[in-house]
Amino acid sequence: EVAEDSGFRTIAAKGTELARPELGHSVHVEVAGLKPNRPYYYRFTAGGERSLRGRARTLPLPGTRTDALKFGVCGCQHYESGFYGAYRHLAREELAFVYHYGDFIYE
């Protein structure tokens, strides 16, 4: 589900996907028809369990002037070295995007 508000009262998009082996047993979702340059909230449900709420922002319209933007950068992490504390800091920021240059997890 993708919503316009953090309480998911106004759903902008929703759908169903399968985690496929050819995509690394993960779900790849492309959402169309969202309004430009605004925040949206998303969540996933699988097997009766619901994810925590995530936040994303759509791009401005092409040609729109942007004076500055803030982005996060992260790389490889290791569960035993701190339970992914850097992501907590990234989530608190109003970022335009996050560039992740390495593996998501080592187990």
Name each region found by the language model:
Residues 1-107:
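Divalent metal-dependent phosphoesterase catalytic cores across multiple superfamilies
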